[in-house]
């Protein structure tokens, strides 16, 4: 990108990429945060299954026009601008008074760019449990200003206290070093690394590349159909590009990994549903390969975001 455009034009894009790297690194060093989130979510789902306020929120029928429009946009486009995501989360938590865990799930179900780390930790930050005692409060004037006065009479809770969570998380010691002998082995790739030809390992020779699709049957958070189809199309596109380069590849279901007994290499999927599957099935024949940017950056992700 820097070869085509000036740093000034690239700066915001680079910042957003590095924010994702930071969030992923922070969660890698504290993976129990993700585990606790899924545990809490399972209980909260049961508690709110018949909650009308929750149903109104996910159906975009809260009578808070800006929020209802964001729900519609999210469902139709599977995307929200970063600023709108912050407003959405703040309204969900502090005005609608719904658990942040359900909101984070709603985002992951619909966002094409949904990511376990940036999504979970972003919602935690808005709630005030990521940086203890500091929450993000959406303000009426701010929404009006940056939506070109599209919305009026926005009644928000602008004096909300942070959500309290007494749990703390210590940094875990992790090894992100790559093994030396990676030639002439089979490689598996998940949906977070579907650009093999631009990866750090594009020049290595692999026997075969398996593109691993994780469908809803193995997910704790079920993706909506548009999101599933989006991922399937990404896999098909990556397969097409690999075949054009005469690289032997195949799309497989994540369950097929259990029947593959040979030693496998894997572009590291990061903390989330794909890694959860590998760990839950105790697939010891898989060795991870880490990106250089992650190897360099994650060791510095030891502080919170203020």
Where do the protein language model's features map onto the residues?
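Structured secondary-structure scaffolds
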Residues: 1-116, 125-131, 136-138, 142-194, ...
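Trp/Phe/Arg-rich N-terminal binding region typifying the photolyase-homology
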Residues: 1-15, 19, 25, 29-42, ...
